[in-house]
Every structure is written in C-alpha cells, then in structure tokens.
UniProtKB/Swiss-Prot annotation:
Residue stretches making up the S4 RNA-binding domain: 43-105
One example GO MF annotation: rRNA binding
Alphabetized UniProt keyword annotations: Ribonucleoprotein, Ribosomal protein, RNA-binding, rRNA-binding
InterPro entries reported for this sequence: Rib_uL2_dom2 (IPR014722), Ribosomal_eS4 (IPR000876), Ribosomal_eS4_central_region (IPR013845), Ribosomal_eS4_central_sf (IPR038237), Ribosomal_eS4_KOW (IPR041982), Ribosomal_eS4_N (IPR013843), S4_RNA-bd (IPR002942), S4_RNA-bd_sf (IPR036986)
Pfam family, one: RS4NT
Family stated for the protein in its record: Belongs to the eukaryotic ribosomal protein eS4 family.
Record-level GO cellular component terms: cytosolic small ribosomal subunit
UniProt keyword rRNA-binding, yes or no: yes
Protein name in UniProt: Small ribosomal subunit protein eS4
UniProt source species: Staphylothermus marinus (strain ATCC 43588 / DSM 3639 / JCM 9404 / F1)
GO annotation terms (biological process): translation
Source superkingdom: Archaea
The encoding gene: rps4e
Length: 252
C-alpha cells in the first residue's frame, strides 16, 4: 500500500481495501482524522454513514447528517465526518436507536454487526501496555487510545494491579468504568483482528512467546476442532467461556 501519512488528501485507489468505496468512479476518498485508530484499521465516519449503512447517497448528504449530530461513537456524538471508527467501537444512530459494533471479519478485515441496546452500553478494549504514574498508580493504555487509571493504595504492594498486557477490559461507554477483565491465557476465547486468519474465533491452546510480540505465536482451536496459528499481535480476547459480544452467525 502506498504511503498515506503526512498528507491531507487520500487517493481512492490507495485507500484501505476493506473500505466499500467506488475507487474507479472517484479520484479521492475521505482521509480519517488523527485519532484513536490508525488509517489501516478504521473507517472514516462518513464512509460508515454513506457506504455501509446507506443513510446518505452523497458525501455532502453524509457530512450534513453527521454535522447535525445524528450519530454517536462509543456513546458520544461525533460531528467530524473524518472521525476514525475502528475495532470494537460502537456506533449509534440517534434518531432510530440502531446500534452497531465494528468487529474483525474474514477477508474484509473490518465490518459492522448490529447489536442490541444492552450490548451497546459497553465495549471491549485490549491493554496494549501499562505505565506507572505519579503516586504509584497504574495507567492502562488501551488499543483504542483510551487510558484507564488503576488507583493503588500501596505502591510497594499494588494488589489492585491484576491487569496484564494483551488482556481485555470490558468497559462501560461513555463512562469508561471497568466491568470485567479477560486475561489472555490458555482457554481464553479470542477473535483474530488481522492477518490471514482475520475474523476467526477460537480458544487459545498455547502461547509460544518470542523475543518480540510479533514473533510470539499463538495456537488456537475453533469450534470445529480445527487448530491454526497466528501472531500474538492479532489475538483479541472476547470472553472466558462465552463471548461478551455478538458475533456473526456460525463464528462460534
């Protein structure tokens, strides 16, 4: 893929392949604003409104609807048509109450699945890394750009710090309260967020750790008993015994 960073405009021909846009009909595509998701892992809000959900026929119509505040992402109204919407984000159409989640799907990389109002109250966010901040408290840095502070009563014995990198938090939106924690262990139910196995779901059989994260290999078993391997980078925990999010029919 051609370089897309550092420029204000994006040619349609070099836009991410999973964007459902008419590349031969239009020279330019909407370039996402800098935000919680990189360009190769998100949709601009305009593309969701116009090309995926079909609420507008043209970019002008989509921009108007978005600027009027008809769409929420993770519980907050977003009026920027370039806003990047990515993995596990929840989209709500304010006027109709319809809600959708962005999930990994085979071949297309990312897609939307309609969810009910209860499920739309939370999202899953993977812990990418942890840092210790002033006072000895722990800050969890999540895949969607969020930071969650874990307050520690005794920095010398931080019993509150039960969270490990690459585990997943179930958090309320928009309040960002931790509802659940799913560690990445053997037996954890995961979905694959990238690579040739993108969108596949299964339980972790084993984790062979390499020197770096991208060289660590995870063996996973799907519901049919088929085993496959993928990079640790692509493994996203979604539950312990059952998924905490709705999946496409037949995925698990």
């Amino acid at each position: 893929m051609a370089r897309m960073g550092g420029k204000k405009h994006l040619k349609a021909l070099v836009a991410p392949k999973f964007w459902p846009i008419l590349r031969k009909e239009y020279k330019w595509a909407v370039k996402p604003s800098p935000g919680p998701h990189p360009i190769e892992r998100c949709f601009p809000l305009l593309i969701i409104v116009r090309d995926i959900l079909g609420y507008a026929k043209t970019a002008r119509e989509a921009r108007k609807l978005i600027s009027e505040g008809h769409f929420k992402v993770d519980g907050r109204v977003r009026k920027n048509y370039k806003y990047p919407v990515g993995l596990m984000d929840v989209i709500e159409i304010v006027d109709t109450g319809e809600t959708y989640r962005v999930i990994p799907v085979p071949v297309k990389v990312l897609g939307l699945i309609e969810i009910d109002k209860e499920e739309a109250k939370y999202k899953l966010s993977r812990i990418e890394n942890k840092t210790t901040v002033k006072g000895g408290h722990i800050q969890l840095n999540l895949h969607d750009g969020r930071n969650v502070l874990i307050k520690v009563s005794d920095p010398k014995n931080p019993v509150e710090d039960i969270y490990k990198t690459l585990g997943t938090l179930q958090i309320s939106i928009p309040e960002q309260q931790i509802l659940n924690y799913i560690p990445l262990d053997e037996g954890t139910l995961v979905i694959i967020s990238g690579g040739r196995n993108v969108g596949r779901v299964g339980k972790v059989v084993s984790i062979h750790k390499g020197i770096r994260r991208h060289r660590s290999i995870v063996t996973i078993e799907d519901k049919h008993g088929n085993k496959f391997q993928t990079s640790l980078t692509y493994v996203f925990p979604i539950g312990k015994e059952e998924p905490l999010i709705k999946l496409p029919e037949g995925a698990w």
